[in-house]
Amino acid sequence: MTLTDAPARPRPRDAGGASPMSLWRLLWLELRRNAMPWMFPLLAALFVFDPFRTAMGYGPFWDLRASVLENKLLPDFVLFVAGVAAWMGSRDSRRHTRDLVDATARPRWTAQLTTWAATTLWVAAGFLCCVAVLYGVTASQATWGGPPWWPVAVSLAELALLSALGFAAGTFFPSRFTAPLAALGAFLLCLEGFRNAVGRSSVYALLSPTTYVPDDDTGLFHHYLPDVSIAQLMFLIGLTLVVLAALALPRAADAGPRLRRAAAVIAVAGLAAAGTAIGLTGTARTQAYGTVIPVLHDGANDRPIPYTRVCGQAAGVPVCVHPAYRSFLPAMTAALVPVLRQIASLPGAPARVDQVVVNDLIPSNGAAIAGVPPVFRLPVPATPDETSFGQNASTFRNSLQSTLVTLFVVGADGFVFMGPPGGSPAQQAVELALLQKAGTAIQTGGGPGNAHAKAEQVATAARRFAALPAATRHAWLAAQLAALRAGRITLAQLP
């Protein structure tokens, strides 16, 4: 029999447990002896080069930047948390000592929970330091809203679960290889969960924190819906309780009847919480501004967030955006001025430019020129300077101009992607001419055979139309715009 198999020192049945002060001293001792702080330099480097760098590429919007906590920072922590927790769980067996068994008058299960708590506290401290840096920088840049805490709570709950799983693996399978295997297993589990959950709406996908990717303007026009976050917390905390209760099962845990009954109650409560979360998530439905779980949903979150628009002027036309996009306004007005000057006073020219919600589930909120007087309704991407789509400031400017010109010439009244000109050949030629005079470099689509020849004809007509004096172009558009929009103008009829 090895030293670690030896039963804990028996306690008199009438003796009381150790005082809370002794438990605090044990926790302090475990905090000092924990291996997690040695991982912080590596985690700090990962934070700077992955989550923080990604977040700084987004606009200064709280919910959008907070998304990196769950889909970037959390996966970076997974490997280290599971590995260190397994290392701490197998520490006593690897050393073949009884020092921790004799160091406390409490049952071994209590000592194990204290070691796990110390590891988890260090993990939480490191994670919250990263959150503080990210939120601190965002607070110095954001002009609207405040920090979202639901992603932080869900991330901490998942880290606690991973710590419990790693610690249990180290306790039940003590070996020098347990820690690296636990780290690898946690990483593969996270990777597989992300692969199977992204783009799906199943219960598994909704309960996976690493799949959270919000819309660009989440938390700006409408409230963040915490329904799924609440279900995730119930699920993760429930599983954590089950894993910790399982540590009381072995005889070496020295858990008497009372502690075993307490562990059983904890396990049942954890299973109930996890099962309830799964059941509630099964009733979830996707709405325009988030996922709703009826039992957990607060109807007050369905109301739009009131705000006062911030406006600028582009060629005498008001350009209004959400206050959070205040820093984007100069770039937007500068991009729209050369186009609005060319189409001023023409039929259908916008009298105002308004920002609308970026949401693929609401087609009516796409780019359009509609209303009386006409209003250019424009969804603005959250990252005009540098986006995940590779969009830079020049591309953002060209996209705004191309979208406005296409909507004006084609007369579209619905969703239009920011992109190259569309419509009939004559419409494309007019669009290219207007964009050329605005300083936008747009190429016509080419191709083999007839397609290439047609593109050359469009480009030639566009150059011919752009070479006209501004007054002549304006007068022709004023007289022929209705026929052009109806598709009755051919390339040969363009002046």
What spans do the regions from the language model cover?
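C-terminal TM-helix exit segments that contain a strictly Trp-centered aromatic cap at the helix terminus
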Residues: 48-50, 126-134, 189-202, 276-281
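Hydrophobic alpha-helical transmembrane segments
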Residues: 1-85, 91-92, 242-287, 293-320, ...
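Secretory targeting signals
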Residues: 50-80, 85-87, 113-177
